[in-house]
A protein has these predicted regions:
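Active-site glycine/GP-rich loop and adjacent strand/helix microenvironment
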Residues: 1-191
Length: 191
């Protein structure tokens, strides 16, 4: 994320040359990351909802929940900027419940890109949101020709389980098996 904003606050944050998150414009807004269920403020590195209070008199917003899932980095930045850094991870609408966790597409993508068999030239995947609470994560993904899909699905499922802490069922299909989108890929689909 090079920069971020909203209509009432055009520049919420911007990245420095370190490219390690967006430094927040904390002199223009109060930025909080909260637990979406409890409303409790979260600390360094914890994932939660982005809530903003804009301090400008003409565009005042009080604890506006942008429904973005983010985390804050409160460690000093090598660039010398003193404001905290924000990392955008996804949208609340893309959270998929699996066991006692909520998984975002970025969580799955980071694992898939460890497997060239599914990520070259790019990973095409979907996370299936269950109609009822489920103990496992269901991921559909395309694979390159010439691989053993059963063995590869097991390896990816094991890695997802190890990284995300929930069992995963991986459904592999040949390239071209998932729909393509002109604008933004639908990474989360309902069962």
């Amino acid at each position: 994320m090079a920069s971020s904003g909203l209509e009432a606050l055009p520049l919420l944050g911007s990245a420095c040359d370190e490219r390690d998150g967006a430094h927040l414009a904390e002199d223009l807004a109060i930025v909080e990351v909260i637990d979406r269920r409890t409303g409790r403020a979260l600390g360094h590195g914890e994932r939660g909802n982005l809530v903003v209070t804009v301090l400008e008199k003409d565009n005042f917003l009080l604890r506006y929940d942008l429904e973005d899932v983010v985390r804050l980095n409160e460690n000093p930045c090598p660039c010398g900027e003193t404001h905290r850094r924000l990392f955008y991870e996804g949208r609340v609408r893309d959270l998929v419940p699996a066991g006692d966790r909520a998984v975002l597409p970025i969580d799955v993508a980071l694992v898939l890109y460890e497997f060239p068999e599914v990520s070259t030239p790019s990973a095409e995947y979907q996370i299936v949101r269950p109609a009822a609470p489920a103990a496992e994560l269901h991921v559909r993904c395309e694979h390159a020709p010439g691989v053993d899909p059963t063995a590869l699905a097991a390896r990816i499922g094991d890695r997802l389980r190890d990284r995300l802490g929930v069992p995963a069922r991986v459904e592999l299909m040949p390239r071209g098996g998932l729909p393509r989108f002109a604008y933004k890929a639908a990474r989360v689909v309902d069962a």
